[in-house]
Design a protein with these regions (language model features):
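Conserved class I S-adenosyl-L-methionine
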Residues: 195-212
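Conserved beta-strand signature within the Rossmann-like core of class I S-adenosyl-L-methionine
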Residues: 187-194
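Conserved SAM/SAH cofactor-binding pocket of Class I
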Residues: 76-162
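SAM-dependent Rossmann-like transferase core, predominantly class I methyltransferases
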Residues: 40-89
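Core SAM-dependent methyltransferase catalytic element
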Residues: 219-232
């Protein structure tokens, strides 16, 4: 006999949809028919518009179903935005996995002398990021579709920031770190926000292996801001 959860999973598999499955010690198995790191979404659209202050600027954001943190800018992204320090090396900034755009747009607004690239695999999120850039009159940006960094292999960056898709799995996140190192200029920096319970210690260890260094820049409410600098 199958459990009720097993029958639900079998029914979903028969639909042919992409599935994201996460296992948590407290919450058990969670089955999601779509997630924010999916390229396309069949979830019905239900756009919402709201205001949010970041780095002293009030932004108007439009969000939708099937995008990350649609009701407000999540705490981890806010902490990353507030903790980030402009690198000493000149060059562009990359918001890796931009979603509807809060990280990239807020940094572009403040660092007007820098060009900010914003990439994501989720087509709905990219459309929202473009709308939010226009609505907030942010012009020093380029928004592209990219699965990790595969769509911007021709670019090098002074800084890369990411709130990585933890539920996509550790291997995906660590691959993002590896690709980010290759995409950085010498003395460029990778900034990552990740919760302790979702793997901050192992993420720091991976960054140390890749870069030879990794620093905890901030810790609040279980969220870690990690920075690694490329020296060669």
């Amino acid at each position: 006999m199958f459990s009720k959860s097993a029958h639900v999973l079998l029914d979903l598999l028969e639909t042919g949809k992409n599935l994201a499955i996460s296992i948590d010690e407290k919450e058990g198995v969670r089955i999601m028919s779509e997630h924010y790191y999916s390229k396309k979404t069949t979830t019905s659209s239900e756009e919402k518009t709201w205001n949010f202050e970041l780095l002293g600027h009030v932004f108007t954001f439009t969000t939708d179903n099937a995008v990350f943190s649609k009701k407000e800018v999540d705490f981890g992204s806010r902490l990353l935005i507030e903790t980030f320090q402009e690198p000493g090396v000149q060059g562009d900034i990359l918001d890796l996995g931009c979603g509807y755009g809060p990280i990239g747009l807020s940094l572009a607004k403040v660092h007007e002398g820098r060009h900010v690239f914003m990439v994501d695999v989720n087509e709905r999120a990219l459309g929202l990021a473009e709308k939010n850039a226009a609505d907030n009159e942010v012009v020093n940006i380029t928004i592209r579709e990219s699965d990790r960094l595969q769509g911007i292999e021709d670019q090098k960056f002074a800084a890369i920031l990411t709130n990585p898709p933890i539920r996509a799995g550790k291997q995906v996140v660590h691959t993002m770190f590896e690709e980010a190192k290759e995409a950085l200029l010498v003395e460029g920096e990778l900034w990552v926000v990740i919760q302790k319970k979702q793997g901050a210690p192992s993420a720091k260890k991976k960054l140390e292996e890749l870069f030879g260094n990794a620093e905890v820049m901030e810790k609040q409410k279980g969220y870690y801001i990690l920075k690694a600098k490329k020296f060669d």
